A protein has these predicted regions:
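Soluble non-cytosolic domains of exported or imported proteins
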Residues: 4-12, 41-45, 108-116, 160-168
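Active-site-adjacent substrate-binding region
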Residues: 110-137
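N-terminal catalytic or cofactor-binding beta/alpha core of small enzyme domains
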Residues: 1-62, 71-72, 76
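Active-site microenvironments of hydrolase-like enzyme catalytic domains
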Residues: 51-102
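Extracytoplasmic/secreted envelope proteins and their assembly/folding machinery
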Residues: 14-18, 45-52, 115-122, 151, ...
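Loop/turn elements at helix/coil->beta-strand transitions in domains of secreted/extracellular proteins
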Residues: 24-27, 59-63, 93-94, 130-132, ...
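Solvent-exposed loop/turn segments at secondary-structure junctions
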Residues: 34-38, 69-74, 102-105, 141-144, ...
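Active-site-adjacent mobile loop/cap segments within catalytic or ligand-binding domains
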Residues: 134-170
Length: 170
């Protein structure tokens, strides 16, 4: 369910991921802005402006991860949740990497670098957690991934997953 309450939305997933990356010694700049509020229209333009601003302010940024929760509905409008049992930890929301390309006609000359990164992440994740990842998706849209190298979209479960399931995926 879509909400602006950061205890239940994608910002919480970003908080959890930032904590895990930080514990691994990886510096994180976590933008907690809801770019799709109050409406979806223009959300990618708004987030692209922020990405450009951050890249100028912090030129050492090596990766941009756009975190989403997928929306999968049943024929009657119910929410589908995607799960993976993580041994000894519980039920986690499955993850899906989405890679944009220039297939829609917009310039994205380095999309294959992002695809290689996604494949490497997918392979490692499947080695460590065999059921955690859904199939990698290659799309014709850019999803602002043209702004920099090392840019991916990550779907953390779906709107049907409990926040705790999505948080465990971090």
């Amino acid at each position: 369910c879509r909400t602006t309450d950061t205890r239940y939305n994608v910002v919480r997933m970003g908080d959890a991921m930032a904590e895990v990356f930080g514990q691994a010694g990886i510096s994180v700049l976590h933008d907690r802005t809801l770019y799709d509020y109050p409406e979806y229209a223009g959300s990618y333009d708004r987030s692209l402006a922020a990405i450009d601003r951050y890249l100028k302010e912090y030129p050492s940024i090596r990766f941009v991860l756009d975190v989403h929760r997928d929306a999968i509905e049943t024929a009657d409008g119910g929410q589908v949740k995607v799960v993976s049992e993580i041994e000894g930890q519980g039920i986690a929301a499955q993850l899906s990497l989405v890679v944009g390309s220039d297939g829609g006609g917009l310039s994205h000359p380095n999309w294959m670098e992002n695809l290689r990164l996604a494949v490497a992440i997918q392979e490692q994740a499947l080695t460590d957690y065999p059921t955690l990842m859904r199939p990698l998706l290659l799309r014709n849209s850019r999803y602002n991934q043209h702004a920099t190298h090392g840019s991916l979209l990550l779907e953390v479960g779906t709107a049907g997953n409990a926040p705790e399931e999505a948080e465990l995926s971090a």
